[in-house]
Regions:
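FKBP-type peptidyl-prolyl cis-trans isomerases
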Residues: 1-305
Length: 305
């Protein structure tokens, strides 16, 4: 049962809801019937609350979406506020919804495709790793032909990688055209996620952060400001894709959403939660994918389909 709903700022949705003693008791009985049920009271009640939320929150979620005309864009985070067997429990939830944004022009973006040049060392390393026997058995002409073949393969790979980078950048350019306020906590969370991704990239490539800054000619403060701007730009692009999908009629049908949800992929949609939110995640992913294709010119206008 909904007790309160409001927004700390546009798009930052907070609510408090309750469940009665009967609902809690039914969930407790379900948990206790399982062989690995928690023995301690706190653990038992916590598991029962989680079961109740996952089983009953979906209807309340749909009610919120319809009554308050919000478009959630993140999974809700739950917080248990109070619980006892005599009264049930009281819990809070927070999620982010599409804030009041406007998108300007979202076609006509231009981004050069710039493959990284190939060094001779790269060719030699590739031959040593994958063509060693072939290279040792070849004569001079064969060795030269092998190097040309490997160079062509590496170049084709780098061209494909460069095209992928250019497509991503085209989509990120959309972020520059999306205007309006963003929830501060959503921006902050996106920045920290971008920072984690950057740190993992440095580690994977064996690059020292100080060396990285030296090559870029930036101070720590300048880099952080740049990374923050990049994170917000990507967030605006991510939200802007939903606006483009709506404007161009690219939303998937219910049947398409159901078909995609039936073959759930955690890498694409994250962990399953509850039915209404899971459908929302799949629907928005499909819409964003189509909007991305539309922006880079690979998806037809809705009127042409």
């Amino acid at each position: 049962k909904l007790e309160h709903f409001g927004m700390a700022e546009p798009g930052d949705c907070r609510l408090v809801f309750t469940a009665g003693a009967e609902e809690l008791a039914a969930a407790v009985a379900q948990v206790q019937a399982e062989p690995d049920a928690p023995q301690e009271e706190d653990g038992l009640l916590t598991e029962a609350v989680n079961r109740t939320i996952l089983g009953g929150f979906s209807a309340l979620y749909e009610q919120l979406v319809q009554e308050y005309h919000v478009v959630p864009v993140t999974d809700p985070d739950f917080e248990l506020l109070a619980v006892n067997r005599a009264e049930g429990f009281r819990a809070g939830a927070q999620f982010y919804a599409l804030p009041p944004l406007e998108v300007g022009a979202y076609t006509g973006f231009v981004q050069p495709i710039e493959p990284h040049p190939i060094r001779q060392l790269t060719i030699e390393l590739e031959i040593n790793r994958h063509h060693g026997d072939e290279e040792r058995a070849a004569d001079a002409a064969g060795k030269a032909a092998l190097r040309q073949q490997v160079a062509r393969e590496i170049w084709a790979q780098r061209c494909a990688q460069a095209e992928q980078r250019a497509r991503k950048e085209l989509v990120w350019q959309l972020g520059d055209a999306v205007k309006g306020p963003l929830p501060k906590q959503l921006v902050g969370g996106n920045y920290f996620a971008e920072q984690r991704q950057f740190n993992l990239s440095l580690q994977a490539n064996g690059i020292n952060f100080d060396q990285f800054l030296k090559v870029r000619g930036q101070t720590v403060e300048e880099f952080r400001a740049w990374l923050h701007a990049q994170a917000e730009r990507k967030l605006r692009s991510w939200l802007g894709l939903l606006l483009v999908a709506e404007k161009e009629g690219l939303a998937p049908t219910d049947a398409e959403v159901e078909a995609a949800a039936a073959h759930w992929d955690a890498k694409l949609d994250g962990e399953r939660t509850f039915p209404a939110n899971d459908a929302r995640k799949v629907r928005q992913r499909l819409a964003r994918e189509r909007a991305e294709q539309f922006i880079v010119g690979l998806y037809p206008h809705a009127a042409a389909r």
